[in-house]
């Protein structure tokens, strides 16, 4: 199964953070699942690092090479179809990064691994 990780799920996974649910952790670790991280998540991480809301112990290139590719996570590029879905989404969720991740999950028919309760307002499969 193809799975799309929300930004916090990815960060908690690579940190070994106990906030990541066992169900989410097992889904990410399962060798039968294909894991994806949106480019939007990397953009969100870069912005949060630059404004001091997030600290990571490596630069973004190292993060991608070590933690994304090193954990066999695929990067999901932003496609025009994702933007069409994004434009049609109702505004239950205001966060632009989460809205794009939602649009990608919907377009690609991928369950999203997230703790964010607002995602439940959309017709997407959630894993937590």
Describe the predicted segments one by one.
Residues 117-128:
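Short, basic/aromatic-enriched C-terminal tail that caps enzymatic domains
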